[in-house]
Regions:
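Phosphate-handling catalytic cores of nucleic-acid transaction enzymes
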Residues: 156-168
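Short glycine-rich phosphate-binding loop at a beta-alpha junction
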Residues: 44-56
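Metal-dependent DNA phosphodiester-chemistry modules and their immediately adjacent helices/loops
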Residues: 63, 67-158
Length: 168
């Protein structure tokens, strides 16, 4: 397959517990929602807000809403995939990667996705994460950028929640 020739090792990554393989040729994002519920149920980790890419998100949103997380309550926050929205987050990710502050535990999927990602700068000097080669995947890199954007937007709220848990 194209992914295999691009360096993807899906079967190995699944065997090692890094990914879950779903049926068909597209990603079943309801499985991602199930993962969040599993984290909450098993480890009692409360999800404060969840950022998501609007592309193909319908199944994810529907399942998350079944579990009680909604867009109306601002539990689910759409992060537009454009340079105006992601510029600050991309610059922060880049700086933290260069400073070796990002610990991805040598996750081979993250390493592969980060290696496939480049930065495109528009005429307004805004950054966007792009594939260095069309056939390669950058989903893990984009997820990290969305995480940084969510942290940037909701840092104060997150820090208050962490402080509250630590004081209990």
């Amino acid at each position: 397959s194209d992914d295999k020739s691009a360096g993807a090792k899906y079967e190995e990554w699944a065997k090692d517990g890094f990914i879950t393989i779903t049926e068909g040729n597209d990603i079943d994002l309801s499985v991602v929602a199930d993962f969040f519920l599993d984290i909450y149920t098993k480890y009692k980790i409360k999800l404060i807000r969840i950022g998501y890419d609007q592309r193909y998100a319908r199944a994810f949103i529907d399942r998350m809403e079944e579990y009680g997380w909604t867009r109306e309550a601002e539990d689910l926050v759409m992060i537009l995939q454009n340079a105006a929205t992601l510029d600050n987050a991309i610059r922060l990710v880049e700086a933290d990667l260069k400073a070796r502050l990002v610990n991805y535990n040598q996750n081979p999927v993250d390493k592969w996705c980060l290696g496939n990602a480049g930065i495109e700068i528009d005429n307004k000097r805004k950054c966007l994460c792009v594939k260095v080669e069309e056939r390669k995947r950058i989903d893990g890199a984009v997820t990290l950028i969305i995480l940084y954007e969510m942290y940037r937007r909701y840092r104060t709220e997150l820090e208050k929640a962490v402080k509250k848990v630590r004081n209990v």
